Each structure stands twice: as C-alpha cells, then as structure tokens.
C-alpha cells in the first residue's frame, strides 16, 4: 500500500521571531530541532520504512529531513531536492515582523495577503530579486520562473507538476514517501490530494515538525490520514 508522509519543517528562527519568511533561508530554532528530532523518533517508533524523501532547497526543510532520517535510522535513503517544494514566496513582506506589518498595512490587508487563495503580497524589490538570482542554489532555474511574490494558488501551480512527474511515481510503485517541506507547499499538496475547496484550504493549519501520514490506494486515492 502506498504511504505518504508530509512533514512541515520544525520551528525556524524566524517563526520564533514572528517574521515573514518565505524564500528567506533561515535555520531551525532549538525548538525546531527538537520537533524534527521527535518527528524522526515517531517514524522509528511506528516502524515506518521510508523508501525515498523529497524536500525543498531551504535549510530549515533540509535539516528537518536530516533529523527525521537520522533519528529513524534511515539516513541512507535517496533524498531529492527541488525549488518547487519551497515555501510560498511572500515578496516584499519577507523579513517583516507580522505585527509590524499589521500596523503598517492594516489587520485586514495582512489577513488577505496571508489567507486568501489567489491574492499575492506586494512584490519584492529588484534588489531583493537580484540576491536570489545570485544564489547558487537557483543557478539552474530560468530567471523568468523566479517569483516576485506568490499566492497560495501560485504555489500550487509550481508544486503539482513536481508531484505528478516525481513524487507520485514512487507512490504508484507502492513505495513509502516522505515529503519534508513548508506550510504552504504542503497545503498545496493537501488541497490536491483531498480536493479541498479554495475557500477551505486557506484555513488548514499545518503543524511544525508533525508527520502527517496518508494511506493511499494503488491509484492514490486517500484511504486514511493521521498524525504520528
């Protein structure tokens, strides 16, 4: 039976500081390391044999993957990394304190940017964009594909082709797959898997460092889901 494990990275240093993070590359906090370690322990305690893992290009997800596989004694399995699993790009909001953003733009506007399905935050500046384009991890990426800002809908548009072309192929082969990613890239996968409406998906809360297991049919219909 195919099995999919979705796990949002452990708490990051910017999560702890209440900052918009998006594509900014930050480390796990001490709490986040503990969450990721515990996630791996839960995988081991439940005797889940992972065949392959997928993660983003951002350190907090990469490190979470490492802790999960190390603690479950499966660090030797293949791990594939893709920008398509990166967090939603929060544009010009990245690096801002969320409370400060509410004071500057208004509570309602910030809520719309955060929780609407198809509304993007303000675009990043050209200077911010140039910093991403200079980052070696994105050298392979056509700069026309590099977002200035993303809605959840935009995130889904880049995540689902990666699901179809890569992740789902291992599941169709009956394997157990770990996806260690981010709140919004995981939200996009859940929307697709469960056919969640545009209105409902924005209210889904994705816990940090909590493995969410999907048991699937051979054609990848959801049979059951549960947190470890």
Swiss-Prot record:
Belongs to the phosphoglycerate mutase family. BPG-dependent PGAM subfamily. HAMAP family: PGAM_GpmA (MF_01039). The lineage of its organism: Bacteria, Bacillati, Bacillota, Bacilli, Bacillales. The gene is gpmA. It comes from Staphylococcus aureus (strain NCTC 8325 / PS 47). GO terms for biological process: gluconeogenesis; glycolytic process. Catalyzes the interconversion of 2-phosphoglycerate and 3-phosphoglycerate. It catalyses: (2R)-2-phosphoglycerate = (2R)-3-phosphoglycerate. This is 2,3-bisphosphoglycerate-dependent phosphoglycerate mutase. The active site is at residues 9, 87. Its EC number is 5.4.2.11. GO terms for molecular function: phosphoglycerate mutase activity. It is an enzyme of class 5 (isomerase).
């Amino acid at each position: 039976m195919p099995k999919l494990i979705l796990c949002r990275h452990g708490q990051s240093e910017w999560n702890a500081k209440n900052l918009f993070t998006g594509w900014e590359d930050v480390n796990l906090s001490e709490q986040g390391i503990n969450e990721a370690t515990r996630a791996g322990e839960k995988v081991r305690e439940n005797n889940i044999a992972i065949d392959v893992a997928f993660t983003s290009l951002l350190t907090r997800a990469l490190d979470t993957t490492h802790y999960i596989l190390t603690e479950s004694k499966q660090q030797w399995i293949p791990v594939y990394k893709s920008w398509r699993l990166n967090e939603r790009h929060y544009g010009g909001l990245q690096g801002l304190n969320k409370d400060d953003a509410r004071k500057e733009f208004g509570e309602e506007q910030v809520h719309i940017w955060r929780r609407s399905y198809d509304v993007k935050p303000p675009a990043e500046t050209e200077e911010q964009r140039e910093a991403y384009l200079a980052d070696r991890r994105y050298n392979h990426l056509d700069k026309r594909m590099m977002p200035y800002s993303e809605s959840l809908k935009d995130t889904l548009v880049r995540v689902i082709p990666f699901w179809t072309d890569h992740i789902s192929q291992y599941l169709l082969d009956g394997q157990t797959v770990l996806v260690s990613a981010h709140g919004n890239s995981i939200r996009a996968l859940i929307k697709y898997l469960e056919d969640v409406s545009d209105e409902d998906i924005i209210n889904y809360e994705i816990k940090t460092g909590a493995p969410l297991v999907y048991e699937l049919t051979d054609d990848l219909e959801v049979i059951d889901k549960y947190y470890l």
